[in-house]
UniProtKB/Swiss-Prot annotation:
GO biological process: isopentenyl diphosphate biosynthetic process, methylerythritol 4-phosphate pathway
Annotated site residues (Positions MEP for the nucleophilic attack) in this chain: 157, 213
Catalyzed reaction equations: 2-C-methyl-D-erythritol 4-phosphate + CTP + H(+) = 4-CDP-2-C-methyl-D-erythritol + diphosphate
The encoding gene: ispD
Any matching Pfam family: IspD
Site features described as Transition state stabilizer, chain residue numbers: 20, 27
NCBIfam families xref list: ispD
Record's subunit section: Homodimer.
Function: Catalyzes the formation of 4-diphosphocytidyl-2-C-methyl-D-erythritol from CTP and 2-C-methyl-D-erythritol 4-phosphate (MEP).
UniProt-recorded name of the protein: 2-C-methyl-D-erythritol 4-phosphate cytidylyltransferase
Amino acid sequence: MAATLLDVCAVVPAAGFGRRMQTECPKQYLSIGNKTILEHSVHALLAHPRVTRVVIAISPGDHRFAQLPLANHPQITVVDGGNERADSVLAGLQAVAKAQWVLVHDAARPCLHQDDLARLLAISENSRVGGILASPVRDTMKRGEPGKNAIAHTVERADLWHALTPQFFPRELLHDCLTRALNEGATITDEASALEYCGFHPALVEGRADNIKVTRPEDLALAEFYLTRTIHQEKA
């Protein structure tokens, strides 16, 4: 029972630029309503009582973060991020060396629901490995021919999931797996892939498909719609 009461720290890698958004401003600083995407993402984490600290890894040349109210928030720590996501996450983990469990959440994923976060955090009661929020694949999936815009074959979707964030792991285990994977030149696309590389099998915790990452211009309007809908539902 005590495991469910442990405080949790979160790491938010926010040093990327997001060139697919086709904007001069990094996507995490684009606004939805009266807040930036980064603020929406961080506030969703801090809304849960177990999340007591959020470490945000930003680019060393970032001048935008200091202009946000987040810069003066007592539960937020800022560190310099790296060139790659894994480097930024490791920098964040160094800042919470005493934490037992850590969340890692995308800076540009502002639509996290509190019930999803609560279900993910609950796995710390019985898991030594952790897990991720994920959404079952619903569309028909095709694998393309290498180097061609042509279908190679249809991929069976029965056991396919979209990996989402937050992802939630024991801090020491995540640190060790990320370090080993990077040192051995493994391709790491998210934190779970580092654990997979080291032979672990994180849990899949089903989350809502509207927990989208803002990656392309059309995602911004969709995220705004989802956030507005959630606010209206909470007020109802």
